């Protein structure tokens, strides 16, 4: 009797689990579709006769026969899969899900998938789980191998996700973790599973997954109705809860265009598409300054914004509604590309200011090739797209983007260039760090002053500590008061002179209450830099001038405040700081991050002065890029104007005895 009872319980449990994952015919799908859409005549007739199961079969037949709808993301005639994607697909069969590339090896989410499992309290890990990055590789694996196991598992996981992640009412601010951290149950889960950005991710990617798995026997009429009802719920959700601003809003709008274009059978499809187009046309004027800089002042998200705007155009070209984007929209994208090309280094990499990640040449060549198709007359873009084989470089070398606050000093466009990129712009948004005045410096094939980067975004405990460390003003190449973060980030350009033997940038930031920072940068004879920092105001405390050193052996001296890299011949530098009497130098361990959860150790340096009066604290730093450290020049520098002058500056610098007077008047 006991064994029989046990068997009945197990059988009931098996039936319950089977039913939980079973595909159900969702008849509400017919009320969501425009059954008068061309090709749906049979579906409409069967539905009106009350034969919804047959209508669902006819609907599946319609989608399998549909040829006029596709996306630019996948070519069904030439599906290929790489080694990494194959691994993602195979691991997903065992519920080991590739949620985030920063957390490898991937975590396993259990035989009975626990979509709420959060092994490391990093918000990105939990959010990005719900982007289902392994679904498209599973689809590719299915198409390449023909093995039904991928389709079977995909449909199971898709239904399982729907069942375990209900859309419940969540206050909008909760999606960005700015509200109540005590939320429980479905509400706590929904802030991750149904954040608009993740929803938009699924909206876009499921158009590819739909195409990849559509021929499978596992893609049943019942599953089709589940899929379409869920997809519709996604679009309606975003429509009512778009993010307020920034790159999230752009992603969501662009993906709503995808949804409306790929599933024109939905009654609201045209409204979805229009919603996305209207936002894109509006936000390109809101988020992009007239110099081409994106208002988050982060090279990574600037690049993302370019590609979002381009993706919207690509889908418009595919479906014939390019005329809904004005010429001004294209002109702005072109300016954004020119901006990005200018602030990038000769090897196609980018400064890692703010939350930027390091790109690579292969990735950027692909981008420039795509952009060159869109702007075939732009010779600069063509030059970069062809790695210099075609097109032409601009006639200028140094270039300033005054509204965005990015300034580039360069003496060449080649890899042998000396190039400094300075970031000193207006107040920006979440991804921007309080680092006004910072810079990166490239010389002859090497970045000698890489930014500290970001490492992680947000989360709990250690994750937030790591985030906050990389965001600090004091781990950038700029000046602080008592090593504290800047109170204000609203730099104003006082002078930009990008031509001649002495090129000059003068930028000023309010920084702290009663203490402003004026930074003057001189690029002398296309060979070395003189940076003058003046901290002006009644505020008292410790003034700290920070420099983040490159990785490797660096000889240094407290006596004369010098640092000379000891790298192999090709790219080295000497830095020497000249400050007030009593200035001290401090060396600390630092970090440099170029990708999410990847970083390496290096040395941070600060030159510290006690400010105990209203007199300005002033520094002169000379940075000489040199090929061989043995050739480090002898340096000296002094102020010619004895006190801070609101309207000008004059300093005298000697390099190996050669005197150079540097000055300006405002």
UniProtKB/Swiss-Prot annotation:
Consequence of changing residue 624 to A: Impaired catalytic activity
Known catalytic reactions: Elimination of sulfate, appears to act on linkages between N-acetyl-D-glucosamine and uronate. Product is an unsaturated sugar
Origin superkingdom: Bacteria
Active site, UniProt feature: 301
EC top class, as a word: lyase
Location of this chain's protein in the cell: Periplasm
Protein name: Heparin-sulfate lyase
